[in-house]
Amino acid sequence: MRDEDCVRFLQWCLPPLGLRWAGYRRVRRTVCKRIERRRRELGLADAAAYRACLIADPGEWTRLDALCRISISRFYRDRAVFDRLVCDVLPNLATKAGRRADTALRCWSAGCASGEEPYSLAIAWRYALRADHPGLRFEIVASDDDPVLLARARAARYPAGSLKDLPRDWRAWAFERDGNVFHLRPALRRSVAFCRQDIRGEWPEGRFDLVLCRNLAFTYFAADRQRVVLQRLSERLRRGGILVIGGHEMLPDGDAGFRRLGSGLPVYRKSS
């Protein structure tokens, strides 16, 4: 598919899926390669024929929606953000939880892909923070709608490249190496509860102290759907809870109900 055909097709098909073209501009070739493979599977001649297929068969839109999912994941991705979480955000949340006499600090990793993000939190807590907060459980819920990615997350076996941003001493403590594959230690695997859910529909139960929703809703979703997600996130976060989004993302309609923490990082505190 030529680039101009790719652009034209995505600009046509993304809005009915509740997605926005601007979020896909940089990753369009990846998505269009998937669409091309699907077109060939169906024995269709070109993009126009696949477009006609979508018009004739509403069920094909579900398959197309899956082809438009983008997941780029590694441990400790955006190191400055994780450093802020470990050095400031999580200790403060843990202290507040202790003052409330809570027994658990709850975190949700939305769109967790193959598990690197929630496992990074688990490693950070157990290695650097847990000893300072005895008696406080760190509960991590991680959700994604891709069963293949979730299976990889539960297996917790990663190539060396996935760990390149993780502090070296943490890596040695958290993983067992088998050649070029790194196995996360069982206790850390058990510390994350994975579930198959689409953020556009079903969500985990309960309220959270920390939510990471990075490079997902506020990149790829249409503006009206972004507003719905943000409202629901606000309802699920405790007052004073923390929302982390992607480094190139912005909250829709400004930061209403949230206050951005300093240093220019995409870390927000719920203020109302």
Spans of model-derived segments:
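A short glycine-rich, Lys/Arg-flanked "PGG" loop and its adjoining helix->strand segment in the class I
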Residues: 226-239
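Core SAM-dependent methyltransferase catalytic element
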Residues: 252-272
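Conserved SAM-binding loop of SAM-dependent methyltransferases across substrates and taxa
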Residues: 114-132
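Conserved class I S-adenosyl-L-methionine
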Residues: 101-120, 139-141
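Conserved beta-strand signature within the Rossmann-like core of class I S-adenosyl-L-methionine
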Residues: 239-247
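Extended basic-aromatic, gly/pro-enriched interface segments that bind polyanionic ligands
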Residues: 110, 131-212, 216-225, 250-252
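Conserved AdoMet
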Residues: 2-108
